[in-house]
Amino acid sequence: APPLLGVRNLRIEFPTRRGTLVAVDGISCSIAPGEVLGVVGESGAGKSLTGAAIIGLLEPPGRVAAGEVRLVGRRIDTLPYDEMRKVRGREIGAIFQDPLTSLNPLYTVGDQLVETITTHLNMSSSAARVRAIELLASTGIPAPERRIDAYPHQFSGGMRQRVVIALALAAEPKLIIADEPTTALDVSIQAQ
């Protein structure tokens, strides 16, 4: 059986006025279901770029110049944007360092969780709301049945990051890409 995630000879480039900057060159890895892979490196080594490339969120002008990314054997680095969006929500969850980039300030966290759940899972809004409350509880949000109707700005940084983690888990993805998910949390919460 193919691995859950297979990355082969990934090369990420940025065109500049002075020529091409190769930011990541020849990254390969394979992740089996249930396996955890930690990527360690100096600041600027390309860890975040690699994660962004895997989930199809590489900021232009950055581009995958070579290599391939496969999810359960299916090539995903060449998918059109709309198709990749479906993969990102349903099959791959993402947790970033800054929770404010992952949450829409105009919608309650409940609205965002329910939308993610109903978009990717065959579930009614009321069932999705129950699941959203369970997710908030499982990530350590106190009084989730009340906090579900709060807006992102009404949560502390640490609590916002827990909401982002709940959002990443909402559609029951096969794979989660987490880029320093606990940076915004204090040390006692990081340990949890």
Task: For the regions a language model picked out, list residue spans one by one.
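Conserved ABC transporter NBD signature motif
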Residues: 64-75
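The feature captures the beta-strand-to-loop junction immediately N-terminal to the Walker
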Residues: 40-41
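Conserved signature/switch motifs of ABC ATPase nucleotide-binding domains
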Residues: 89, 153, 170-171
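Conserved ABC ATPase "signature" region
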Residues: 75, 127-146
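A short, proline-enriched helix->beta-strand linker immediately N-terminal to the Walker B motif
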Residues: 170-174, 190
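A short, flexible loop at the N-terminus of ABC-type nucleotide-binding domains that lies
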Residues: 3-4, 13-26, 57-64, 80-84, ...
